[in-house]
Design a protein with these regions (language model features):
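Divalent metal-coordination and catalytic microenvironments
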Residues: 37, 60, 70, 85, ...
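Acidic/histidine-rich helix-loop elements
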Residues: 42-55, 131-132, 192-200
C-alpha cells in the first residue's frame, strides 16, 4: 500500500510538472492547450459544502468546427468561453455535450442555446434536468441512450454511457484522432478524494470505469471533472478508489 501511494504521489508530481501552460486566464476562466486543437477549460463553481470548486471542461476544434464538453457554471462565463473559441480558434461551435445534470456541466446551457448551438446529453440527463424543480436547469435538446457519435470537421467524437458512478447519468466523451478522453466527474484526479457522493452509485462506480477503460484502450490523455488531467493512471486510481 505504501508503495502504491508513493507511486501515486510521484505520478502526481510528474503530471503537475508536465501540465501545458495556460494560454488564456482571467479571474473566471482559464484555458490550457493540451494537443493541437484540443483545450481544457477551467472555471469555478461556488458551492455550499465545498466552497469554490475548480471545474474542468474541454474544447476540440477541427477544420473550422468545434465542440464543447460541459458548460461553465454561469451564463456570463459561458459567454466568455464562446467568445474565446470564436476569436482564438476561428471555428464554428457545432455542439455542446453535457456530461451529467449538475451545474458544473450545464449551468450555462441557456447561453449556448441562445446563440444557436445544439446540445447533447444522455436521455437520463434530460430526464433528471427536467425533473429538477429546485434548480430548474435548462434541459439539453438531444438525448441518447448508450452511445452517440458526432462529427466535428469530419472527425468522430464518441459519447458513451459506461454505467452509473458519480451520478446515474454520467457519460464520457472520446476523441480518437487525438486520443483524448473527457471523463468528467466519473473520473477522479490523482490524489483526489471521493468528492460529492450525494447522487452517486458507489457500488457500480468501479465497474463503470472498467467499462471506460475497455471501451477506449487507446485513450492517452484523460481529463477528470475536477483536478489535474493526466494519463490512464487516472482510470486505475478511480477503479481502486471505488473497487471492492
Amino acid at each position: 500500500m505504501k508503495t502504491y501511494l508513493l507511486l501515486i504521489l510521484c505520478t502526481c508530481t510528474l503530471i503537475a510538472s508536465a501540465q501545458p501552460p495556460t494560454i488564456y486566464k482571467t479571474t473566471t476562466l482559464e484555458i490550457d492547450s493540451i494537443t493541437p486543437g484540443t483545450y481544457v477549460h477551467r472555471t469555478y463553481l461556488s458551492t455550499k459544502d465545498w466552497g469554490l470548486v475548480s471545474c474542468n471542461g474541454a474544447v476540440y476544434t477541427n477544420k473550422g468546427e468545434s465542440v464543447v464538453f460541459d458548460t461553465p457554471a454561469t451564463d456570463s462565463v459561458s459567454l466568455e468561453l464562446i467568445s474565446w473559441i470564436k476569436t482564438h480558434t476561428r471555428s464554428c461551435i457545432k455542439a455542446i455535450v453535457v456530461n451529467h445534470s449538475h451545474a458544473d456541466c450545464l449551468g450555462g446551457l441557456a447561453v449556448f442555446h441562445k446563440v444557436g448551438i445544439p446540445s447533447y446529453s444522455s436521455k437520463r440527463t434530460q430526464t433528471f434536468a427536467g425533473n429538477d424543480t429546485v434548480n430548474k436547469p435548462v434541459v439539453p435538446q438531444h438525448g441518447f441512450t448508450k452511445e452517440l457519435e458526432l462529427k466535428i470537421g469530419g472527425t468522430s467524437i464518441i459519447n458513451y454511457f459506461p454505467g452509473e458512478g458519480h451520478t446515474q447519468d454520467n457519460i464520457v466523451s472520446y476523441i480518437p484522432s487525438v486520443k483524448v478522453l473527457f471523463g468528467g466527474c466519473i473520473i477522479k484526479a490523482l490524489g483526489s478524494g471521493k468528492g460529492n457522493l450525494a447522487e452517486a452509485n458507489i457500488n457500480a462506480w468501479a465497474e463503470s470505469v472498467r467499462n471506460v477503460k475497455q471501451k477506449f484502450p487507446d485513450a492517452v490523455i484523460i481529463i477528470p471533472g475536477h483536478g489535474a488531467y493526466g494519463n490512464r493512471s487516472l482510470l486505475d486510481y478511480t477503479i481502486q478508489m471505488f473497487g471492492k
